[in-house]
């Protein structure tokens, strides 16, 4: 009913054969944030996605924007290796109150579910401050304060270049947040438009 014609579901052995010795290591956008908090994660992502692109040649591959860093890692890998596939980033789907849809949301207690909306609220606040011309450090502090006031353990709250995930210069930026509620860890982001010379 969803227009799906085929599902490719290889065995673990097919994807990771015995004596599997090759890894795809992406630097650049894989450094920092999730790359620091989950060592080796993006190497695993890049390796299996590269294998998938070789096993199932496709014109386009669709990735959700909620994991913005992952979209940049995959896009950089595709560009660097000259892979003939277009990476298309799909908008994040959200609950009516703004919380990004995630399978992890089901692990939240009712109280933590109420608090979790502070992630999207922090991003909305960042977007508003960005449009007023606020500097980056105060924006990051405001995001962190919004999350902490809701009882979220903040892993990071940052404004960086939307492509490189490095310091913002004059291009588009992205606000990234990650935090913990109980044993559940959530991430979210919001793109910010270019606005000329930027300072911290």
Regions found by a protein language model. Name each.
Residues 3-4, 170-172:
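Short glycine/proline-enriched coil/turn segments at helix->beta-strand junctions
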Residues 157:
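Substrate/ligand-engaging "lid" and interaction regions
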Residues 1-152, 160, 164, 183, ...:
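Nucleotidyltransferase catalytic core that binds NTPs
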Residues 166-168, 174-200:
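Short, basic/aromatic-enriched C-terminal tail that caps enzymatic domains
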């Amino acid at each position: 009913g969803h227009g799906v014609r085929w599902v490719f579901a290889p065995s673990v052995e097919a994807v990771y054969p015995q004596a599997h010795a090759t890894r795809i290591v992406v630097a650049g956008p894989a450094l920092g944030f999730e790359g620091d908090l989950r060592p080796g994660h993006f190497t695993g992502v890049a390796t299996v996605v590269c294998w998938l692109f070789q096993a199932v040649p496709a014109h386009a591959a669709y990735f959700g924007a909620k994991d913005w860093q992952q979209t940049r890692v995959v896009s950089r890998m595709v560009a660097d290796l000259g892979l003939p596939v277009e990476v298309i980033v799909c908008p994040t789907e959200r609950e009516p109150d703004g919380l990004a849809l995630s399978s992890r949301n089901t692990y939240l207690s009712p109280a933590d579910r109420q608090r979790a909306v502070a992630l999207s609220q922090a991003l909305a606040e960042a977007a508003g401050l960005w449009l007023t011309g606020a500097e980056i450090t105060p924006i990051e502090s405001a995001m962190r304060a919004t999350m902490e006031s809701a009882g979220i353990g903040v892993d990071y709250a940052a404004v960086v270049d939307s492509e490189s995930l490095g310091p913002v210069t004059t291009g588009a930026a992205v606000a990234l947040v990650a935090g913990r509620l109980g044993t559940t860890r959530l991430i979210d982001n919001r793109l910010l438009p270019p606005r000329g010379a930027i300072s911290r």
